[in-house]
């Protein structure tokens, strides 16, 4: 049985700013661009979150919600330096560290000799060292796979640890609302609820074929996740260049209206994937992919820095117009800035790899 830890620094950028300037502690704080320059919130502390402020929110909207909000511009060089220090700590326990962003990573400690191989003790020690050596807090989840470990790390935030042991997986996942499943956004969750599935336990009553009938190939993923099954490996060198979702339909989509109805579901799934990948501020382009009944395909894309349904609808219309034929496959996605993707995952070690790497 694997031992996977998901580590997630609490409000990373804001935590570093509060560490470096104690006058900011206890006051609502957002890191991001100025509202007059149409800036957005990169992250905010928990005092700001009490006002409903969250990452990716336009800063002007954040200031309306909290007129006393303190705004600090991002200091990316400083954040990368802190990330290097934190990842050096991770690498001291296992070489199997998969960066998801500057502030988030998976660790596979299955074969680690540290602390008698206890995933719980390793997570506790990592949190202690980051707090004492770096001066910020990390929340961690320990579980037999990546899906459950990521959910667990969010369970006792901030500055928390939650462990899901192998014998607890079944009951833990059964009680989860369907919204917690990877790739399920608002539209998909609403469809699941209309079909009578409120929790993963409810969803287990559905066979894989029935889920596939309603949700296409994503139905097979739902079938596994609602049972706590996730075979993805921790991949230390993974660099994400795009995020996408596509579906091949058992019955061709004959009209543009048919395509637009399905597009809404796909965009919802894409938004959920982008959010979980922490890739929202790395988007460079958006695209729509179509494969027609004659198996010929086309892709339409444009420069646009966020997931927005109207933009995808416009691209879909352009692509559909090219052939005006029934569509057998539909896909949506975003392309990421390659330099930013490197900065998020590889430039952590731009000044040389951490000890043990």
From Swiss-Prot:
Gene3D superfamilies: 3.30.70.270, 3.40.1170.60, 5' to 3' exonuclease, C-terminal subdomain (1.10.150.20), DNA polymerase, Y-family, little finger domain (3.30.1490.100). This is DNA polymerase IV. Belongs to the DNA polymerase type-Y family. GO terms for biological process: DNA-templated DNA replication; error-prone translesion synthesis; SOS response. Poorly processive, error-prone DNA polymerase involved in untargeted mutagenesis. Copies undamaged DNA at stalled replication forks, which arise in vivo from mismatched or misaligned primer ends. These misaligned primers can be extended by PolIV. Exhibits no 3'-5' exonuclease (proofreading) activity. May be involved in translesional synthesis, in conjunction with the beta clamp from PolIII. Signal peptide: none annotated. The lineage of its organism: Bacteria, Pseudomonadati, Pseudomonadota, Betaproteobacteria, Burkholderiales. It comes from Ralstonia nicotianae (strain ATCC BAA-1114 / GMI1000). The keyword Ribonucleoprotein does not apply. Disulfide bonds: none annotated. Its EC number is 2.7.7.7. Residues 4-185 form the UmuC domain. Its main location: cytoplasm. The record marks 13 as: Substrate discrimination. Its cofactor is Mg(2+). Keywords: Cytoplasm, DNA damage, DNA repair, DNA replication, DNA-binding, DNA-directed DNA polymerase, Magnesium, Metal-binding, Mutator protein, Nucleotidyltransferase, Transferase.
